[in-house]
Every structure is written in structure tokens, then in C-alpha cells.
Amino acid sequence: MVKVGIIGGSGLEDPNILLNPTAISIDTPYGQPSDHLIQGTINGVECVLLARHGRKHDIMPGNVNYRANLWALYSLGVDVIIASTACGSLKEEVAPGHLLFPDSVFDRTNSRKATFFDGTFSGAPGVSHIQAHPTYNEKLRQVLISTAEKCKLVHHRTGFGVCIEGPRFSTKAESMVFKSWGASLVNMTMMPECILAKELGIPYATTALVTDYDCWKDEDQVTAASVMKVFAANVEKAKTLFIEAVAEIGKIDWSAEILQTKTAARQSIMISPDVEVEFLKVPKT
């Protein structure tokens, strides 16, 4: 049966969504993940929960050890990953309290370790020129969308986010430029998480929890307090979504999807095909 990794953003680090939760401490070649990983089940499906910012929310977006987080989930054998992320809206119709299921991302980060293939001692062999499109696994994305429809949660099926370095919010000039690009969201944690999952050959999709209108909208000033107030209201929606989505994911045979994802990741590496990459092993056909 499939094993689901869940990366929870702000507010979604509650281990009580799991039955029989067990905390697991893991060290990785890339250092420590953000917190203990919590293993348990949801609707009979094995799950591993990781709080992206730590359970005390004391790790800012640029300091999250994304590589360690993804490697830790891989080492516990997760087959697919679903995530949540708080976002500001760049479109009037994408209102605070809504959910959006991104289909792409524009990367504006500048100081994050964004690949496992970095030539260091701990790094994977070779150089990976991973295809960044499609950014998210479409089959997994559709499960989240259909679950939101089933749960009658107000949501948007498509849209892309601009991922900024943070931890500050956008300037007015930045917000207006991002809006002019046609982006739906501005965010601080979409990258490089989705790309690292692709490098590991793990299907990944995220749910954007809209907390505010970014500062392009003059009448709404973005503050940490206002963001957290709306986010607190979103948390219960996201929990409902994930609990139901995990049940749906558990009904699906993911073997072909995982094979395709791992094969694509292996083919992206500039290295002799005879070199074995342990974490991208696929069954012989």
C-alpha cells in the first residue's frame, strides 16, 4: 500500500491528525530536518508528517533545510508527498480563506540549497538537469482538487505562485510586478521543495492556503497578525482536505506513476547510465 508524506506549513503540524503517532528522529547526509517526523496512519493509510518550520514555528523560510526534510521523508519510505503552504493573493477573485492548487511556480529565491546534486561529499553523483515542468504531479494534484470539490471547500484549480526569499513581505513595487506577470499567489516556501521531490523521484503536490491580499491591494495592509488570523481559520479546512485526500490516495495504485517519476529523475542526470543512483532505483521491466 502507498505511504504518504505530509509536509505541513504554518498551523498544519498537528500530530493529532494521525492515529497512533510516533515521533522519529532522523539524521541525513544534509543535516537535521526541521523537526522529528511523526509516523502514524490516516484512514488506514500509512503517513509521515513533517512540520516545515518546526513544531514551534521557529525556522524562517530561507533557513528551512529543505534537502534534509525531503531526504528524511524518502528514508522513511514515503511514496508520494502532499504539502500545504501559506500564500498571499495577487488576484481579486482568489480571496483570503480560499484554497488554490498551483500548477507552476516562479522562483525568486536566492540563497537556498536547491539540489541534491551539488558535487559535495554528501551530494548525489553527477549533475541533475531536472525538468521543472510540470512542476507538480498532475495525478496527485487532481486528487486534491477532487477532494476539495467533495468537501465543498472554496478553491481554485489552477494558478502559479511567485516564491520570494522572505522573511519580509513584498514591497508595493514587487507586488505590482508579480501581479502584472499573471501570478495568482506570492509565497515563501514553494521552492525548492517541489524540485527536490522531483530529484528524488517522488510525486509531489501542494495546497496553497490563501491568507491575505498582498500589498498591491491598497485597502488591505498585510501584517503577521492578520495573516495568522486568517490562517487559523484555514487550518481546519486543510486538515479536512488532507484527511479525505489521504483516504483517496490510498485507493489508487501509484506504481506506474512512481516508476515514471523515478525514471524521469534518473534520465535528468548527466552521468554514465551504468552508474547506479540508489534512491532512483526502479524495477526492471
Curated annotation (Swiss-Prot):
Query: What residues does the record give for site: Important for substrate specificity?
Result: S170, A224
Where does this protein hold phosphate? S10, R52, H53, T85, A86, T189
The answer on whether this UniProt entry bears the keyword Transmembrane reads: no
Q: Which GO terms describe its molecular function?
A: S-methyl-5-thioadenosine phosphorylase activity
The answer to keyword Nucleus applying to this record is: yes
Top enzyme class, one word, equals transferase
| Residue ranges that the Swiss-Prot or TrEMBL entry lists as coiled coil | none
Concerning NCBIfam families, the annotation shows:
MTAP
Q: How does it assemble?
A: Homotrimer.
According to UniProt, the name of this protein is S-methyl-5'-thioadenosine phosphorylase
Its taxonomic placement starts with:
Eukaryota, Metazoa, Ecdysozoa, Nematoda, Chromadorea
